Amino acid sequence: MEEFQGHIELDRSWQDNFFYPLIFQEYIYAFAYDHGLNKSILLENAGDKKYSLLIVKRLITRMYQQNHLILSANDSNQNEFFGHKHKKNLYSQMISEGFAVIVEIPFSLLLISSLEGKEIVKSPNLRSIHSIFPFFEDKFLHLNYVLDILIPYPAHLEILVQTLRYWVKDASSLHLLRFFLYEYRNWNSLSIPKESIYIFSKRNQRLFLFLYNFHVCEYESIFVFLRNQSSHLRSTSFGALLERIHFYGKLEYLVNVFTKDFGVILWLFKEPFPHYVRYQGKSILASKGTSLLMHKWKYYLIHFWQCHFSVWSQPRRIYINRLSNHSLDFMGFFSSVRLNSSVVRSQMLENSFLIDNTIMKFDTIIPIIPLIGSLAKAKFCNVLGHPISKSVWTDLSDSDIIDRFGRICKNLSHYYSGSSRKKSLYRIKYILRLSCARTLARKHKSTVRAFLKRLGSEFLEEFFTEEEKVLSLILPRDSFTSRELYRGRFWYFDIICIHNLANDE
């Protein structure tokens, strides 16, 4: 037990730092808008893990001299056309952005210290959304059931403050956090909406993204097991959650989880190979076990959230599905495990017989109906999928119109490049190409056929990805190798987040 308790002990060196005085430094807001800053330079030296307020003040002062996003007193007359309400919202938003940066500082240093202590190399591939799907392909073929979980959110804003209170001992900063939460009451935007793309409100996005990830990782860390066959609630490896939007871990052994704060022993169910994956507000827990075991996991999670985090989760927010019978709606794909049968004729001497081979295959299918609905909402087509002109773009230049359509088409091609069936993707690309042609024809008061005849093949090349352009130069389009490459699945490890299609302008 002492060994477990040693793992749970926190590094108190940074908890005594007070962040509240930085709120009154106007330079901190230049820091808030400089997202490219490498926070590792906040360490005083290479061998010291302590965070320095002096270094932070020097950095934000230097950035302020090159940043013009800060409103000064001289700008008050220029901003009089803003109403009082708009000014209040603008200033409060800037303060919340600065507060988010200040709170992120110690957790960023904790992440760096954790990675260095474990000698873990930070790989950009781990941050990619697509890195989850190769994990599915490798593991799900051997699993039976999956829990489809909508992560609950606190019913009261004070729960967020209490969660952060364990780590931040600055009472003034916590009071300021309460002010932001009760001022805007944006926590409802963290619930699971109908459109999976939207989870956080655009206002105060950085602050609420941090609070949401921090709150989730508090109870999510119980699923993270150390390699030395022990586990504790506040694992040192939880810091990876602060950097990535998604997280997956593997449970390997049944252990006693000692929780210093709760003062109780939590027992996990004996299960050798469950796998956990989360992206934004949705998570899945896949297992090789039986249906009874998955029902135990379901009610364990419900009672765990209610008893220890005061979070109400209804049973209907957790679905138990058998992988061989149901598709998993996750991250814009319908994923399933299906049986792929093939018959082989074998000849042995004078006897011939047929061998029926059954192979498990992981399928990722594009949800064509919801995607056409998104295109219809963005005015690229009607609800039936027939392309229409984008009238609001007719005032733009021809090159801008083609560039916008081409960028959306390329983004969709990259994201859905891992689909098992490319027919739906080709239909989406056809809708965008014809919508672009109709928009240009409407602008020039011409017909689509005449406009396409004038532009020729150069118009279609704008919608090709870089990979498709290279393949068209190397291989003939009708060759067998080319067709196999076009039908193949590709996962791009440079995709970090999903952008809203309608606002990708």
Curated annotation (Swiss-Prot):
Gene Ontology molecular function: RNA binding
UniProt entry keywords in alphabetical sequence: Chloroplast, mRNA processing, Plastid, RNA-binding, tRNA processing
Compartment(s) where it occurs, according to its Swiss-Prot or TrEMBL record: Plastid, Chloroplast
Biological processes annotated in GO: mRNA processing; RNA splicing; tRNA processing
Major subcellular location class: plastid
GO cellular component: chloroplast
Purpose of the protein: Usually encoded in the trnK tRNA gene intron. Probably assists in splicing its own and other chloroplast group II introns.
Family as reported in the entry's similarity comment: Belongs to the intron maturase 2 family. MatK subfamily.
HAMAP family: MatK
Protein name: Maturase K
Classification of source organism: Eukaryota, Viridiplantae, Streptophyta, Embryophyta, Tracheophyta
The encoding gene: matK
